[in-house]
């Protein structure tokens, strides 16, 4: 059952020009990203059959974010978020063209260097895109906007990965890189059409970047709900090594080397298609209240573990694709709903730094997870199926943590206590108590 204030995807895009242009830019840019990813994976597998070589590419895609996020968060909260996104797109256009020189050289370090630069620029773009959404979308439409953004990522993953596999197989790696570079130009053009009407961001010019990070650190300590919400994607990233595992499992189940690029594309398409339906189904059948979002996240961690057990027992491309799709279906619920809850719980002046913090910790955990997959395959001699089994066990841990934290907070609220700014009478919807008891609870809070 949906809320009265709920809005559909098509209506949101039709009525909100600014968000529509942001969304168009996302569609084009992410299509190119997945073309790029499939081309890079195929190139590395052509140069090396080492699990660590693939893990190195994944770490090059992830770890630069950890180093760049402290700078990016401050920049996003100080400078026009629209300007940050356009500059990032234009610079990435130049960097991606550098991949055209890699195939002839056949040097892994050059691939890693280009990936590091490209991802560092993405470290500015993604927090800016996340932080600008509340200034373009009314509060009551934030869950829909986040669900649409998450579903778009999923569709572009499915379509872009499949297209990438076809393009690389038929036209070669160079064509995929050229198309990817052009998508950044188109994305920048769409974003340039967004009117500069962001909400004012508080800028204390006397503060340096370090002081501003201390400020947001104090905010997160005082607001444990926001802190834990910003760590949920890191919990999801515990099993992020699936990014390294997918190409390795594709090679394991496909006997023909000529089918490898297409097989990787199929698996990543399954990953994208699965992620489309998670938030959509929850929103359609259960609504989008904060309580629904909270418990959907908890359930999704445990259901994701079940899907990884299925992956661990897969022996062909189609059952493997089904397991990957199921895993990302539940992962998308965690991703989209945690972002929406952060938007609803965090003042605008902190959003850039909070999303940068979230991205930094998540990518650090994901980088470690991908390195762990490569190490387990190369050094420990584990099979891809055995690694997937360990992932199934690990993803249960953040689910237990979130369930325990949620139970603790709701118990405190039932007792009339506050947890940060979340109080028994809480407009964010964390309040688990019936409205008829508001007067009784408010009196209890005042007495304390």
Where are these regions (language model features)?
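MFS-fold secondary transporters
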Residues: 36, 45, 98-102, 118, ...
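Helix-loop junctions on the cytosolic side of multi-pass membrane transporters
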Residues: 131, 135, 173, 177-207, ...
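Primarily residues marking transmembrane-helix entry/exit sites
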Residues: 15-23, 51, 108-112, 212, ...
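C-terminal transmembrane bundle of multi-pass solute transporters/carriers
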Residues: 57, 67, 78, 84, ...
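Juxtamembrane intracellular "pre-TM" segments in multi-pass secondary transporters
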Residues: 2-20, 197-231, 438
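Transmembrane alpha-helix termini and helix-breaking/packing motifs in multi-pass membrane transporters
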Residues: 38-48, 99-102, 159-179, 252-254, ...
